[in-house]
């Protein structure tokens, strides 16, 4: 499908920013466009019964540079001051440094939320590498 770019828009050669994206972010909310741009299917699973969820209740995609490389399901334990990673899944285009980059972003998010640390406690193929990356911080 066609996409449009303003003729005066300057396109950077390479983008290296990292961000955890809300499922309600415009970049994610228009699912057809998300699939075209990033070749990933992001579905909001909050209305899906727990036993049928693939990635988690409220999953945040991780944008690493120009690629969605992972997705995480998070929960804040405010009493313990911990950001819990209930699930961490790598995307097919995940980079070798995805776990480390994600650990940094999760630590930033924890600080922003007034939490003291991040702990990977859940499932997913990225959970163990993420836990290891978090232990080095």
What residue spans do the PLM features occupy?
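Long, charged, low-complexity, helical-prone intrinsically disordered regions
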Residues: 1-137
